[in-house]
């Protein structure tokens, strides 16, 4: 999203990918018993917090702040909230399933399905909306 309208540092993608892999792999290893579920949870939280730090205070946040495209800034802000709030649902589900004494499988399915709706469908709709807004602005300036 930012790459399309501003110059970003090359390592940003890799840092976000590493944070994501740390989060997902740690919690997967904890869930499958290859490491302590508590350690998997904590390391996963560290990976997620690293992603959030990159989005708020790292190169991604700085690139967005210097971007002059309102549509991209709106989409970045909304998606950053989704990553902050929406991704926490996965941690809540992991905690409920593995650390809080277990949870009803139907409740977990509802939790994870709501997280997927928020984190995948709405995420994509925000990007689509920003692209439409940007296209409309570009078309209106070309007509003048």
Where are each of the predicted segments found?
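Polytopic alpha-helical membrane-helix bundles and their juxtamembrane interface segments
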Residues: 1-144
